[in-house]
């Protein structure tokens, strides 16, 4: 099939959306012709916004949903596609096409805003309207959880018949063997924290847990991946920090593999996660997760 792929994020970049876009995009490419339609459109609209508003107004793609709808509707007419897969509700809301349209997501705006609590009421109202338009317009919706599905039905009156729940995976590209090692009983317990948003993912709580264990005489280490503590930490040889691991880089992927291989527990007292790909990654390595 010829598949049009609409996404504001680059589906070729493994760092976007925890690698789910990349896994979806490349998996489809194995058997179909998949085109990232209008890959420059989002960037061009962003540049237009910056040129006109400088730094006086934050860029929110929701404000350009009508423009996105017009641009993508025109682009889709230039080639014969069998299906459209859309990642962003602000792309789908005003899209005009006879081609079957699939919307894929991990949450609804209603659920998202329960945690993020946007203060701009007019923007919140607009986002709710766009989400509703997208949900009603599309032919099929794929969510990764019953949680998101229930919200779509209850908060946006979505038709249950057109929603499918497909759980996402770990998005690990290499088939790297995991050593079957059993740590000695007196070996340190290696704790792992993975998260880009230190506060939302509970980074301070993880440090508290680590220091509490050390204070009780437990031998342990802590590896922090994806962010840095906002405060300066006393020098501790048992804490390793990797602010960013680039999954498009083979050396970084191997480093990520090495970190997961030697970890005993993932600790992630997160306050907000739509699905939690990191838990899938931990499961792939047989690592118990503590929330």
Question: Predicted regions span which residues?
Answer:
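Active-site proximal beta-strand in glycosyltransferases
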Residues: 95-115, 121
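Membrane-proximal helix-turn-helix segments that form the acceptor-binding/catalytic region
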Residues: 120-141
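Carbohydrate-associated surface elements
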Residues: 147, 169
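Conserved donor-binding/catalytic core segment of Leloir-type glycosyltransferases
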Residues: 179-201, 206-212, 222-223
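Aromatic "clamp/platform" in nucleotide-sugar-dependent glycosyltransferases that forms part
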Residues: 271
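Short hydrophobic beta-strand element within catalytic cores of glycosyltransferases
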Residues: 288-291
């Amino acid at each position: 099939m010829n598949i049009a792929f609409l996404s504001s994020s680059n589906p070729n970049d493994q760092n976007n959306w925890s690698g789910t876009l990349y896994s979806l995009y490349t998996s489809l490419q194995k058997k179909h012709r998949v085109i990232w339609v209008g890959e420059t459109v989002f960037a061009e609209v962003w540049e237009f916004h910056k040129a006109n508003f400088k730094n006086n107004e934050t860029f929110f793609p929701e404000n350009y949903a009508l423009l996105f709808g017009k641009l993508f509707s025109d682009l889709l007419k230039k080639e014969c596609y069998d299906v459209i897969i859309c990642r962003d509700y602000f792309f789908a809301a005003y899209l005009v096409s006879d081609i079957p349209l699939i919307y894929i997501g991990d949450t609804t705006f209603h659920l998202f805003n329960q945690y993020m609590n946007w203060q701009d009421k007019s923007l919140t109202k607009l986002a709710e309207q766009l989400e509703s338009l997208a949900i009603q317009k599309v032919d099929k919706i794929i969510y990764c959880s019953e949680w998101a599905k229930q919200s779509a039905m209850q908060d946006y009156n979505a038709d249950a018949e057109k929603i499918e729940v497909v759980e996402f995976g770990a998005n690990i590209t290499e088939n790297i063997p995991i050593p079957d090692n059993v740590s000695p009983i007196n070996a340190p317990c290696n704790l792992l924290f993975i998260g880009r948003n230190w506060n939302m993912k509970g980074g301070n709580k993880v440090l508290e847990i680590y220091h509490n264990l050390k204070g009780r005489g437990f031998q342990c280490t802590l590896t922090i991946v994806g962010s840095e503590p906002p405060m300066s930490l006393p020098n501790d040889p048992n804490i390793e920090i990797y602010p960013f691991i680039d999954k498009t880089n083979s050396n970084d992927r191997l480093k990520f593999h090495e970190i997961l291989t030697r970890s005993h527990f993932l600790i992630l007292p997160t306050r907000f996660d739509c699905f939690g790909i990191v838990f899938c990654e931990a499961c792939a390595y047989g690592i118990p997760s503590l929330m």
